[in-house]
Each structure stands twice: as structure tokens, then as C-alpha cells.
């Protein structure tokens, strides 16, 4: 069994504040696209450079990656939604890459030697986030990514003091900081920001393996819920989360929780045994519960 150590709250993990009078729910991700991934031909959206540090939109690019063992002809395929581009007759070799550039000439000057490239799309990638959709020649969606510059697509950090108070800010180096947005593990769904990260090198890695690539990354923690939504002082609170990984067995996660009266976090293991409000044993949904708390107690927790 491998153990992945995650950072404490303040670094992008899912945190929830519970109050027996008023409960606020965490921002939740949906599991989708987990079972059969990828759908068509193994081609996935693998890298997005949507906000160059230069602010020159002609430097934007999207990289596709063929994860399969067969070459894929993208003739008459299209990029839709965020930008619009129809592919010429171009083939992506097995386990190879194709760069789609906003302006092929500008890209070639900035990244000499990178091949193959196509380009000249209509539109501009949003700096705040939007949806990119890849369609095959029949108009069927092959892949779709809705990226963002906050939430699970960024890292939460302490903000600057403001009137003697410090709040939280989102840090996304791929948002104008000189980095691209790269897929960590193309063998897992790219629908979730947990499987993406800012490149570790300036300008990203177009036409090559991603700098953040990791075939054995920590499991994605999705669908974090608590129940009841507004707990009473007599209620134990059930916490559930779905773990998604390239391995189907041997997964484990811990729940850290702390009432506002406590200084240290308490730890409980999330279990997938069918006996902790987690549905069926072995279904990937993990559960645990925390004790009832007096009325008015706020509880911070993370998985």
C-alpha cells in the first residue's frame, strides 16, 4: 500500500465548515467519465496554455495526446466552445502529441523544433476559465475539459492583510504566471482540476510529455458530502467521498476534523466496507462519521 501525504487546509484541499445552526456545503465535484476513459481513440486534451505571461493571445496553445497504441487521423475533427478550429488531415502517432496553436507562425518562433503543429483558430481562450470540446468528424464529443483559475484548479493560500484581516486567495501559476496547465495522469479523467497542475517549467511542454506527468499520483478525492446538510446537536455527521485512482484496490484516505473548541485535528479512516454510510462495499465510495456536537459548534474538516 502506498501512502500519499497531503497538505493541511489552506493549500487547495476540500475543507468544509459545519455549524449545527447553519451549514455551508463544500464546492463539490461530480465523478463523471470515470468508468470508460478515454472514450474515442485515446485522444485527450493534455495541456492548455490559455493565459501567456506576455498577454499575447497569439501564444496560446492546446496540446492533444494520443494515449492509445494506434495512430489516430484527426482529419475533419474540430475544437469547439472556447475556440473554433477544424483539423486538416493530420495524424497523431501512438502515444504521440499534436499542438494546436492560436497562431502557428508565432508558436513556431517561440517553440522552434516542436512538431507536429497545426493552428490558426478563431476566438481566444478565456483567462478565467471555460469549456474546450474536441469533436470527431461525426460531431461526437471525444473529450471536453472545463478549466478554471480557482477552486480545485488552483492552490488556496493566505491573502495579504486587509484591515487587519487576512482572507484566502487562489494561486494559479498557469493564469498569467508563465506556466501552462498540464494534465498529471492522462490515464485518469481530465474532468477534474485535481488531475491538472501548473507546469514546472516556463511556457509548458508543448509536443512532449508533461512536466507534471505522474502515472501513480495520489487518488482524486471527489464528491465530498456531509449529511445531514444542517445537523442538529443530536446528530452524528456522516462524511462521504469518492476515491478515483488507476488502481482499483488498496485505496485509503483519512478524515481530519476539528471542532472550533479544539486546537488539534482528530483523525478517522474513511472506509469502503458498506458499513459506514458508503453504499456497497468496494464501490469506491468511502464513508465515516464524526460525533454530535453542541448547538452552535463549528467543525472544520478535510479529507
Predicted regions and their residues:
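Activation on beta-sandwich/Ig-like modules and their edge loops
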Residues: 39-192, 215-219, 226
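Bacterial N-terminal signal peptides
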Residues: 25-38
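Hydrophobic topogenic segments
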Residues: 20, 26-28, 201
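N-terminal secretory signal peptides that target proteins for export/translocation
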Residues: 1-23
